[in-house]
Amino acid sequence: MKISFISDLHTKHWQWEVANKEQLDNFHNSDVIVFSGDMSSRGYEHEVKNFLEWFNNLNKSAVKIFIAGNHDFFFDTEWYGRTRLGVDRHESHNEIIQKDIEKLLCVYPDLIYLNDSGFEYKGVKFWGSPITPWFHDWAFNRLDDEIGSHWEVIPDDIDILITHGPPFGIGDLLHPKFQRLNEDKNVGCPHLLKEIDRVKPIIHAFGHIHEGWGTYKQDNTLFINASCLNQDYKPINPPITIELDLLTKTTKII
């Protein structure tokens, strides 16, 4: 099974496709395409629609899976309802936003949206979550004292874990210009790293930290930071494509 991974396009999907046109053969011929969040810049519905239209029209034979990221406010019912509607959290407002999300997703029935949920294809089990550690109240942020219990719900038997943010120490090193004195240069989630040690997925795909783009192997897990934009938001990072052997559950980067 050929799987391509992308992330963090921030409305620049068209520019990215043009900039990487000579490196997209495997991408356009993949069996599965996985997007790890941050399709938008400011989380507006029109930004999300524009991306989903592009994503939906990629390789029609491919299964396309996506999650939201911390920029994708539209998908966060609590955040969007609380801030855009100018009200405190209230169930009725959350339901209104949820209906808007469902209405939009119905336009693209072939796209698989994961929000702390799973999907199985040809025996390969995917599980996706948009949650990231707290950072100035962006979408899907969780405080340190609650994010640990969140990751504990990741099933034990998944093959491919998709999150927006990285685990601590893997693909999470900030570019020097973003590093601050007396603050950790690695900004991934230690609680997520702990649960990865429990779950032991074949692949963990993420983005969020653009400068961490690339692949990392630790024990038997292949970690993929698939950020398509670099730290300067230039769309220069190509997709990362792997071949997954369905019998041995081993991977090869192609």
What are these regions (language model features)?
Residues 18-21, 48-51, 79-83, 141, ...:
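Short, glycine/charged-enriched secondary-structure capping and boundary segments
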Residues 1-4, 111, 118-128, 156, ...:
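Beta-strand-turn-beta hairpins that frame and shape the catalytic cleft
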Residues 1-66, 72-78, 153-157, 162:
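N-terminal active-site segment of His-dependent metallophosphoesterases
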Residues 27-28, 35, 51, 60, ...:
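Aromatic-residue hotspot detector
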Residues 120-122, 191-199, 203, 210-254:
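Binuclear metal-dependent phosphoesterase catalytic core
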Residues 5-7, 33-38, 63-70, 114-115, ...:
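Active-site neighborhood of phospho(di)ester-bond hydrolases with catalytic His/Asp-centered motifs
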